[in-house]
Amino acid sequence: MTNIRKTHPLMKIVNNAFIDLPAPSNISSWWNFGSLLGICLVLQILTGLFLAMHYTADTATAFSSVTHICRDVNYGWIIRYMHANGASMFFICLFMHVGRGLYYGSYTFLETWNVGVILLFATMATAFMGYCLPWGQMSFWGATVITNLLSAIPYIGTNLVEWIWGGFSVDKATLTRFFAFHFILPFIIAALAMVHLLFLHETGSNSPTGISSDADGIPFRPYYTIKDILGALLLIMGLMLLVLFSPDLLGDPDNYTPANPLNTPPHIKPEWYFLFAYAILRSIPNKLGGVLALVLSILILSLYTLIHTSKQRSMMFRPISQCLFWILVADLLTLTWIGGQPVEHPYIIIGQLASILYFTLILVLMPVASTIGNNLLKW
């Protein structure tokens, strides 16, 4: 008799995606981050659901409702900190996942990669709106500064900003709609993640060598299910260490002060995972130029498929490209550091140089290095 998992319409889908899926036999731990992102998403939706039961999206009570969650709700403090630090873990996994895709040439799976870029944008939008909800000083001023960037768009900018605000400033209407969007977007992200997987399973996974592994596939279960469980345990352990020992390590002390439109914090900055893009935005003196650079810093990922000049897919056997990749990683870390610093000398010039290097590496140096690699191998 045929196994039910192979015949039942619903179980057949699960079977083909997670059990009998042929996977390359040589994929390393860098391939764990996809499943970890799935776990992060489920965790964020669950903790967020319980937070939404006690949160009120109103400027008068939002801050005190978050305080109430932490003080009066049973285990509310752990749910709140798991949600806040879960976002940080989410972005750590996202950056690792994207980095692995760049290093091993996964961007040649065009549809999978572009859905991934859309997922990144959606996750960034969700995180930004979530940061605005506690209605502390940094929530309010972060919302004001970032939404105000849209006013740089010619002709329609000012109208667009007021339309998003629901008035002439960030107020009750803004908070209410941000809560609505913050609630719905994770479900859209979950749907997009399914599309992402659908496209991935059309081609099969990439491997460290970048060579087709059709001739050497192994079943996903038990080999990679066990590997994913190990990754999940390490992720949860890391998250709980953060939540239980230093829950406010990655937050901003200013957000423990209720929002006050009459008092601007001395240094407005977003959460740590947006600092690299924020540094690129600030490094350009022109408002519209800064906004374009900010969007391009992420959108440039979808250009990778067009500027891949190497005859090899992966960077595994391309030492020059490897060097440039790790310089790019160092550059992003530098930008992250600069984004958290005040706008003064020498941080301004460091930020500008790091921003120029970021775009030069991706658009010029990496394609040139790939071409040199081809010539050295007489391809």
Swiss-Prot record:
Superkingdom as given in the UniProt entry: Eukaryota
CDD domains membership: cytochrome_b_C, Cytochrome_b_N
Residues given in the record as heme b b566 binding sites: H97, H196
InterPro entries on file: Cyt_b/b6_C, Cyt_b/b6_C_sf, Cyt_b/b6_N, Cytb/b6-like_sf, Cytochrome_b, Cytochrome_b_C_euk/bac, Cytochrome_b_N_euk/bac, Di-haem_cyt_TM
Cofactor: heme b
GO MF annotation terms: metal ion binding; ubiquinol-cytochrome-c reductase activity
Binding site for a ubiquinone: H201
Keywords: Electron transport, Heme, Iron, Membrane, Metal-binding, Mitochondrion, Mitochondrion inner membrane, Respiratory chain, Transmembrane, Transmembrane helix, Transport, Ubiquinone
Subcellular location(s) per record: Mitochondrion inner membrane
Cofactor binding remark: Binds 2 heme b groups non-covalently.
GO cellular component terms listed in the entry, alphabetical order: mitochondrial inner membrane; respiratory chain complex III
SUPFAM superfamilies recorded: a domain/subunit of cytochrome bc1 complex (Ubiquinol-cytochrome c reductase) (SSF81648), Transmembrane di-heme cytochromes (SSF81342)
Residues binding heme b b562, per UniProt: H83, H182
Transmembrane segments: 33-53, 77-98, 113-133, 178-198, 226-246, 288-308, 320-340, 347-367
PROSITE patterns listed in its UniProt record: CYTB_CTER, CYTB_NTER
Self-association state and partner proteins as the record states: The cytochrome bc1 complex contains 11 subunits: 3 respiratory subunits (MT-CYB, CYC1 and UQCRFS1), 2 core proteins (UQCRC1 and UQCRC2) and 6 low-molecular weight proteins (UQCRH/QCR6, UQCRB/QCR7, UQCRQ/QCR8, UQCR10/QCR9, UQCR11/QCR10 and a cleavage product of UQCRFS1). This cytochrome bc1 complex then forms a dimer.
Entry function: Component of the ubiquinol-cytochrome c reductase complex (complex III or cytochrome b-c1 complex) that is part of the mitochondrial respiratory chain. The b-c1 complex mediates electron transfer from ubiquinol to cytochrome c. Contributes to the generation of a proton gradient across the mitochondrial membrane that is then used for ATP synthesis.
Name listed for the protein in its UniProt record: Cytochrome b
Gene name tied to this protein: MT-CYB
